[in-house]
């Protein structure tokens, strides 16, 4: 996990391709709702498409849009996976 007023962000599969990177450290001075953070990410990279379809995990636990991201967290962003 990151320390201080940052979060460690991991991007997987198509999300990483659209972002052009697999990992970055982002500043985060105060807690933020995951949905708000995802919305900001979609604005930053419109190629991701609607933020509502993206999935995330905080500190290796799958969470929904109402979860809270806090400084020091590790956030993983990925697309839904289906099988069949």
Mark where each language-model region is.
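Ubiquitin-like/PB1-type beta-grasp interaction modules and other compact soluble beta-rich domains
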Residues: 1-83
